[in-house]
Amino acid sequence: MLLPLIVFLLSVLIHHRIYSSFFLHFYSPQYYMICSRLTLLSSCSWHDFHLKLILLEFASQSTNPVPALHNDPTYEKISRRFHENPEAFADVFARAWFKLLHRDMGPQTRYLGPEVPEEELIWQDPIPAVDYELTDAEIAELKAKILDSGLTVSDLVTTAWASASTFRGSDMRGGANGARIRLAPQKDWEVNQPEQLTKVLTVLEDIQNQLDKKVSIADLIVLGGSAAIEKSAQDAGFDVTVPFALGRGDATQEQTDIESFEVLEPISDGFRNYQKKQYSVSAEELLLDKAQLLNLTAPEMTVLVDGMRVLGTNYNGTQHGVFTDRVGTLTNDFFVNLLDMGVEWKPMDGGLYEARNRKTGEVVRTATRVDLVFGSNSVLRALVEVYAQDDNKEKFVGDFIAAWIKVMNADRFDLD
């Protein structure tokens, strides 16, 4: 019943240009509360106030005035403009309603049907189409150049993860496509360590500029991560190829709504052992939230945390959870040492823990709650015990690569 009602109201408002005296009566307190809730639920910024003004048409017929909306010069101008210009009202309403109904559908490439608008809107996070192809030989050559550039495995994996892990399955935003990690606001996020990020991006851009063929920075970032993982697996004794799907474009700053992207900034990323501050929610619960936004399963989350630790991707290079002497090598050392019964874990300040040798009392490693939940939670510990087995090292490498590719391609809707 709701859909026909919506269609009818749209038809009345747009085709017959009927706009009520709503804009002169102004709004009741109930309207204002609905307006605020719409702002939160639809990720609409306050400069989109048109949306709130128009949608309140459907809320109630109450005409109790709200002095702020009547007297505030900004709100009054908007209301009066719509009252005096019904065509502008109809256009803004159509756009605002379209935005509200499609806000969680992701980019325009996910839309289906003959009525998809040709115009791309900035809130759809547009990305230029790719117009190049590379052969397998050219991709292999690119990998070699990246590995010879002086960037470490940690540099390449951290940057690729930072770019791709912004993806949110809840509204299909974020991800590596577009390479917005090099643009504001992502390039300045604390979790991305701007100084280190700038160093890596500068090297990748130099490689891009030296190429005879066109390739996007977005593809180079992901390819760099793939090359680094292949090297780390080879150092562990496994000759593997990380699948790579070409076709990411580079968005521009003009195609990026800074205010809209600020809400994607992570307050916590357990995969990089990062947390902005202490929250009422535990660090391990924030890890679960991050994992579900990335559409990861429990095994996928588990292998990714191990791999990220042993590859040295911790925020600011901390050693918490880095349970290995072979940093940069893709091993299951994190799992093996987490299960070490020769140490006793004791709490420290700041939500950290230290492992002391049961015989000598020497501190041998430190960890966060995120690290230790893989030993304390029954489901996660069962997974850890599987991957810690000597005969499952190759399985771990294969499963890590599969989970890694899932994150790298999370926003590649063109591959579905």
UniProtKB/Swiss-Prot annotation:
Cofactor(s) listed in the protein's UniProt record: heme b
EC number, as in UniProt: 1.11.1.21
GO biological process: cellular response to hydrogen peroxide; hydrogen peroxide catabolic process
Main enzyme class: oxidoreductase
Molecular-function GO term, any one: catalase activity
SUPFAM superfamilies in the cross-refs: Heme-dependent peroxidases (SSF48113)
Gene Ontology CC terms, in alphabetical order: cytosol
UniProt keyword list: Heme, Hydrogen peroxide, Iron, Metal-binding, Oxidoreductase, Peroxidase, Signal
Post-translational modification: Formation of the three residue Trp-Tyr-Met cross-link is important for the catalase, but not the peroxidase activity of the enzyme.
Family: Belongs to the peroxidase family. Peroxidase/catalase subfamily.
Descriptive protein name: Catalase-peroxidase 2
Species this chain originates from: Alkaliphilus metalliredigens (strain QYMF)
